[in-house]
Amino acid sequence: FDEKLKLCLNCKRCEVACPENVKIADLIQEARIKYSTAKPSLRDRMLANTDFVGTLAHNFAPITNFALGLKPVKAVMDSVLKIDKHRTFPSYSFQTFEQWYKKHAAEQEAYKKHVAYFHGCYANYNFPQLSKDLLKILNACGYGVRLLEKEKCCGVALVANGLSDQAKKQGELNMNSMRKAIAAGDDVLTTSSTCTFTMRDEYKNLLKIDNDDVAPHLSLATRWLYRMVESGKIKLAFRKDFHQKLAYHTACHMERMGWAIYSTELLRMIPGVELTLLDSNCCGISGTYGFKKENYKRSQAIGAPLFKQIEELKPDFVSTDCETCKWQIEMSTSRKVKNPISTLAEALDVEETRRLNKA
């Protein structure tokens, strides 16, 4: 096993570029799973187990967020855990989305039509507002939102850190939960491009999880919304006083799926949005990759062209469908980053949208 294979970010850009459709990144990941003899370190296990860490961190969110920003704490993590001291950690929310949702579940059941929602780690532990933004849009369109019976992290960080057996167990649980939702007549939506790609493609290709029956019903929320609008099944109305200059970054896994068009076309439906598509570049963080001391400089060098273009454009916000891209861009530029769903929710004329959809 060549340890240099660990330098692969699994961004899939080699697969996008390959004219023969060779799944190069999959071959590298399969080799890492099969032949790597190195046991995951404590650092790698911590970075990979997002559900466990998120559960601990959110319960002490104010303290956690304060501590993770202290230079002495960063220095200790750098020297002991080899998590680079220059890396900025995402903040945690004291109230998770699941906790918030329990108080509103009855309201969601009152709708005649429903979708199921896989929120993932970020929209649960770090930024529940993204999940709330999705509910705002779907409710205005006449759809209630149900959570899955059970949900675990999609497992992308587990695979990247040598814990593929655990990733497979979590993947099987997620697929079984989605099957129940689909059997009830609900499509399953997500708000993370990486979660979507992992469950749709990596489960089958890397973890050998049978998901053929689930994949057609699993979609990124922007893709589902765009297709529903185009088919005339839902209508969106937007505020006349909303104006923003946005720069859209196509996350690597979004590019591999070919789904950026859905997010950008939805954003273009907002009359007050001036949208610029950023050049096709990886931001460099690749999930947990950019947190590791041995990768940090390389991570920042990979993202440098993207950061430069963003600073030159000076948008009001950067838009992207990937949460780790958001962390990297916000840390490395002067701009804040929003998921397209959050922009749509902010721009939405809720009352008019409800009227148009008879919600």
Describe each model-derived feature in a short phrase.
Residues K6, E15-P19, Y122, N126:
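Conserved aromatic-histidine-acidic binding/catalytic patches
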